[in-house]
């Protein structure tokens, strides 16, 4: 007797109270610092044009400096201390007692899908929860940006008769740090000197400033934007703003963008792309300080989905409701150097250091505490200096 496997029926219908398309567009490693001000329109004209009709956040800060812990924060609304996914050698799983973003949309009746090649957001980490469909291929084996964009457009067209939630990811910016071959369309715009590779074999989190990699990074972003333009055009040709909720967000910046001598958690590493367009989204550019933990409550609020606000660390920013974030946690948990600093926002910034006892017992490593000085608040962070002790 042959075994048969059946999936859930796919309802071909649109219901009031839902969007026809909700898209979480994860751009791994897209640093806000390189697309500030006029540089945004210069490097990413298609993305600028699309999201200028919505909300662009210029002061979104990542809770962690690399993908594994940071992405877990985005999808769970929990900071690293609460989801405990931080160790580069010990695999973890999203807390089962805390619903993920995808589970909230599934509960609302959306047809939920995930298409990406991120090896730090795989099913065994809990990212398959709430999904009707999961299409996973390693980035270098079928999920590169040019392939992913076309696959997403085909997917959206295929399931056009449903109210669909789709999580997609593009991770090719890591190719710069990893020293992999870039697209021919990128390489032809680089000089021979810029194509020379340095710090090969060093994990991207720990890389030092590199003018060559910075040039490669910016050229890759321009190439990405050209590809993203196909997706934006498809969306605008098939939906109105009242029918969609589109977000583009990132998990961390890049170490090789930080000038020599600046602190580890500089804005080039911590500030990330964060933007939204669609129903309930204001047309604005905001410099309100936002955490990546806020991504879950923002998406749920914009989609009119109830969520358990008391059980997560993410909050709704003031530009959406009358609320003001009191602090942001910027964490470096890259073993063996682990520290956490909490930036207190009111008045002159204060800092709080917490010993990560649970992580120490689990990882069997040591703790290096890094002290931050000279916190200055002029409605946003202007500079941040670091000194060890």
Q: Which ranges hold each PLM region?
A:
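Catalytic domains that recognize anionic headgroups
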Residues: 1-389
